[in-house]
From Swiss-Prot:
Location within or outside the cell: Golgi apparatus membrane
GO molecular function, one term: 3'-phosphoadenosine 5'-phosphosulfate transmembrane transporter activity
InterPro entries: SCL35B1-4/HUT1
GO biological process assignments: 3'-phosphoadenosine 5'-phosphosulfate transport; transmembrane transport
Any one of the GO CC terms: endoplasmic reticulum membrane
Record-given protein name: Adenosine 3'-phospho 5'-phosphosulfate transporter 1
Keywords tagged on the record: Golgi apparatus, Membrane, Transmembrane, Transmembrane helix, Transport
Membrane topology (UniProt): Multi-pass membrane protein
Organism the protein comes from: Caenorhabditis elegans
Coiled coil start-end: none
Function field: Mediates the transport of adenosine 3'-phospho 5'-phosphosulfate (PAPS), from cytosol into Golgi. PAPS is a universal sulfuryl donor for sulfation events that take place in the Golgi.
Organismal lineage: Eukaryota, Metazoa, Ecdysozoa, Nematoda, Chromadorea
């Protein structure tokens, strides 16, 4: 039986996983990635050593290799104009009208992220948990079990969508100053972060998962100091810790806290994996913001294309080495409605990326981390309302703590705006 196909009645394995398995799996993944990274590193070294031989005004393979390994540093001297300078300084609105516009924009991004992620969750659950009928035997159903193929399809659709947008507005795009390979860092960290997150679910209890995910804001701030040299005041760190505490209190006290979690222990492996998830996720957000801050900045569609290009390569290499790429394609060809669901899942993910990159570009990684925390809380609130569950007193206190911390931070930024430009989360 193909590895991408699971019997419809396959039982779940409840016994604790072997803690020696995940390091081996991670090693094999990194070994597979090295088959791409090593030749790429050699190519980058060669082009950088002979960069003058690759300088040409014409579109050719030499120009593409130069853009990949060296970038276009000569465009860094181009004046970016008052419009961009003004945009970098308007993160804190100075008037009530600007404040309303920023709030509307933030709510629009939040709604877009919420809708696309909910759609992805529904479609992914449909694909993974339910069987698909064979086109030649309608009474036979098979489950699809290769989640990495779904990620690969998501990257391909996002790659095509970003390429179409770039082709349409090519003349409006800023010069891409950094070398193209810098997007591979985002792809790698995002891939490893997702892997650590899913792998950690086998080793950590629900309370540990909750506290770690709620701490994402603080970890993102610390990583911002390391990656971008962004300085935060003790007051801002205090607000971040307060948000983490309030979110943890809410999520741990909500009536749905036991849903989807059967692990009652937390092992050392689980803590390592959760730490890996938080660190790589925080690096991803801050590295993207660092690229957005280049002058002229990288556009969100350039970012989207570069990240998905390298992510698609990494996923393809992994699928080929595991022997599941062709079996997954064969599954789609042989089963009714599977290709449709995968396309809708991938399209939802691609549109969601546009909202995510727009949020990071406009408001920064900290705001995005806060949005994801609030999104998780609102999902529980909506579930509580829809199914008639009761929201506990401690959960309500945690909910109020989170929004009080956000309000206090915003109020302080407005109070201090007369002292000069302030940092924005």
């Amino acid at each position: 039986m193909d590895r991408s196909i699971m019997p419809i009645d396959s039982p779940a394995r409840d016994k604790p996983p072997d803690e020696l398995v995940w390091p081996l799996r991670l090693f094999l993944i990194l070994l597979g990635y090295s088959t791409v990274a090593t030749p790429a590193a050699i190519l980058i070294y060669y082009v950088r050593r002979n960069r003058h031989a690759f300088e040409t005004p014409y579109l050719s393979i030499r120009l593409l290799l130069r853009s990949f390994a060296v970038g276009n540093p000569e465009y860094q001297l181009i004046p970016t104009g008052e419009k961009q300078a003004r945009k970098e300084n308007d993160s804190i609105p100075q008037t009530r009208a600007q404040c309303i516009n920023v709030i509307i924009l933030l709510l629009f991004f939040f709604s877009g992220i919420q809708v696309t992620l909910v759609a992805m969750g529904v479609l992914q659950e449909r694909i993974i948990t339910r069987g698909y009928r064979r086109s030649d035997q309608l009474e036979v159903e098979d489950k699809f079990g290769e989640t990495q193929f779904l990620i690969f399809c998501n990257r391909i659709v996002a790659l095509v969508l970003s390429l179409m947008i770039l082709a349409k507005d090519w003349t409006k795009q800023p010069p891409h100053v950094p070398p193209l390979y810098v997007h591979s860092y985002t792809s790698f960290s995002n891939t490893i972060s997702s892997w650590c997150q899913y792998e950690a679910l086998k080793y950590v209890s629900f309370p540990t998962q909750t506290i770690c995910k709620a701490s994402k804001v603080v970890v993102t701030m610390l990583m911002g100091r390391l990656v971008r040299g962004q300085r935060y005041s003790w007051f801002e760190y205090g607000c971040g810790c307060t948000i983490a505490f309030g979110a943890s209190l809410f999520l741990l006290s909500s009536s749905s806290k036991g849903a989807g979690s059967t692990i009652t222990y937390t092992s050392f492996s689980g803590m390592i994996l959760m730490a890996g998830y938080l660190l790589f996720d925080a690096f991803t957000l801050n590295w993207q913001k660092a690229l957005f801050d280049t002058k002229p900045k990288v556009s969100k569609y350039q970012m989207m294309f570069g990240v998905n290009f390298f992510s698609a390569i990494l996923c393809a290499v992994s699928l080929i080495e595991q022997g599941t790429l062709w079996s997954s394609i064969k599954f789609g060809a042989e089963h009714v409605d599977f290709s449709r669901d995968v396309f809708l899942l991938s399209l939802s993910g691609a549109i969601g990326q546009i909202f995510i990159y727009s949020t990071i570009e406009r408001f920064g990684p900290i705001v995005f981390a806060v949005i994801m925390t609030i999104r998780q809380m609102l999902s529980i609130v909506l579930s509580t309302i829809m199914y008639g569950h009761e929201l506990t007193f401690l959960a309500a206190i945690g909910f109020m703590i989170v929004f009080a911390a956000i309000f206090v931070d915003i109020h302080k930024k407005y109070s201090d705006k007369s002292r000069g430009p302030q940092r924005s989360w």
